[in-house]
């Protein structure tokens, strides 16, 4: 996205010239972002260093809100604010889509306007093509490359909730979904409303990339942003919608993705029982041949839910695994799935020995099992020890291991208690390595949001 905005700022031809010069000048040496900015600024002086400082060097993103002008003023205002209160401005070109709705037809795209947002705000007139519409709805980031937290006006947000799935342009549908997701994360849209919107898309969305994103967000919303009573209300609705999509899918890839989501979402007695029947071979998944990894995933879920005979299910699954590496992984993870919290704690304590962290993907899966939302309350006492081990994890593991360790540890939690543990850990260590502190803040961001929203 940054490169696209850089190209827009200097122009396509100068951008190409600059890239050629950059690659030629530094073909056999080291170069960084600032070297590219310097070359482009020489070609087309336009305060690129100031632009780069805000866009690249400093953290944060703008909040861009859409406001309707008063009666008799046919237009909208796009207001840009700096959430860090530093009065920064992110100059960029926005593509603003104007749409109308109809009860009998799909929403109609009336006009796309190119808008230059150079300061704190910009007024955008309602285009002539939209003035006869009874109600005009606006998507301020319809180009797909705009950067920021975009906040539509209430009418447009409601329109996206109810009608995003009927938008003809797949890019607009994708932008609409991301806008709804951001609205939920910012507590402007209730999680249950987001799930209602998702149900409209699950069966009908033809774009596989967008389906994948929606299913990921649905799973996270269900497990982290709903209260237990809300999950009980929504379990059957989501399970039925996803299973219907399994049956209706026309491609194996699509069917497999829906079935994977069904396994991850299953929490009602009926859904867990169905997974048990599929695992045992009593029931088939229409049009889908299950792999051994699928059956291992089902056995894992049955153990997490402590389904009747879960120990025997794990024993039976182990007896069917012929690949020695896969069997070793399965055996390694057994204790992380146990119903006894003390056995799970012992698994965690074993990770203090570097020899038991040799297979890092196995370690991360074990932590994810321990901290699964179903087991999260019992796992809270293990959060602080995991944070205390982080510096050693960085020294003894792969470069990506610390981020994975944190994601697996915090990924199932949504309680204020865990938020407080993380905050107290960092507050007590003012000299903690900045990179690791940043990773902790990044991993805990969703915990904080979920704790606040799901209260």
Indicate residue ranges for each PLM-predicted region:
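Amphipathic alpha-helical substructures
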Residues: 1-77, 190-208
């Amino acid at each position: 996205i940054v490169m696209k905005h850089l190209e827009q700022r200097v122009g396509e031809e100068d951008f190409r010239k600059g890239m050629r010069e950059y690659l030629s000048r530094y073909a056999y040496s080291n170069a960084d972002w600032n070297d590219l900015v310097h070359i482009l600024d020489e070609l087309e002086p336009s305060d690129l260093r100031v632009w780069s400082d805000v866009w690249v060097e400093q953290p944060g993103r703008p909040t861009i809100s859409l406001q309707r002008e008063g009666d008799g003023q046919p237009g909208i205002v796009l207001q840009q604010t700096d959430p860090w209160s530093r009065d920064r401005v992110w100059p960029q070109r926005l593509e603003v889509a104007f749409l109308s709705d109809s009860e009998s037809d799909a929403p109609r795209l009336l006009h796309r306007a190119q808008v230059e947002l150079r300061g704190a705000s910009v007024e955008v007139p309602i285009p002539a093509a939209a003035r006869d519409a009874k109600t005009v709805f606006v998507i301020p980031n319809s180009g797909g490359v705009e950067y920021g937290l975009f906040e539509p006006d209430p009418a447009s947000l409601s329109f996206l909730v109810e009608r995003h799935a009927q938008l003809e342009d797949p890019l607009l549908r994708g932008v609409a979904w991301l806008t709804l997701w951001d609205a939920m994360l910012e507590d402007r849209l209730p999680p249950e409303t987001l799930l209602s919107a998702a149900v409209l898309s699950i069966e009908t969305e033809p774009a596989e990339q967008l389906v994948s994103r929606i299913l990921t967000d649905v799973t996270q919303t269900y497990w982290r942003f709903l209260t237990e009573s809300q999950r009980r209300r929504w379990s059957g609705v989501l399970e039925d919608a996803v299973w219907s999509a399994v049956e209706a899918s026309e491609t194996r890839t699509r069917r497999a993705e829906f079935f994977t989501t069904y396994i991850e979402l299953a929490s009602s007695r009926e859904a867990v029982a169905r997974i048990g029947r599929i695992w045992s071979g009593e029931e088939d998944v229409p049009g889908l041949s299950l792999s051994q990894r699928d059956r291992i995933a089902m056995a894992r879920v049955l153990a997490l839910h402590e389904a009747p005979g879960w120990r025997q299910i794990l024993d039976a699954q182990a007896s069917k695994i012929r690949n020695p590496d896969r069997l070793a992984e399965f055996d390694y993870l057994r204790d992380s799935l146990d119903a006894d919290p003390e056995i799970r704690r012992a698994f965690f304590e074993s990770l203090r020995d570097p020899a038991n962290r040799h297979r890092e993907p196995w370690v991360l899966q074990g932590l994810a099992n321990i901290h699964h939302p179903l087991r999260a309350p019992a796992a809270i006492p293990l959060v602080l020890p995991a944070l205390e081990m982080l510096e050693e994890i960085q020294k003894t593991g792969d470069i990506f291991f610390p981020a994975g360790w944190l994601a697996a540890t915090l990924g199932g939690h949504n309680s204020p208690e865990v938020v407080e543990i993380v905050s107290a850990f960092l507050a007590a260590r003012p000299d903690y390595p900045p990179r690791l502190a940043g990773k902790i803040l990044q991993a805990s961001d969703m915990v904080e949001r979920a704790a606040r929203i799901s209260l």
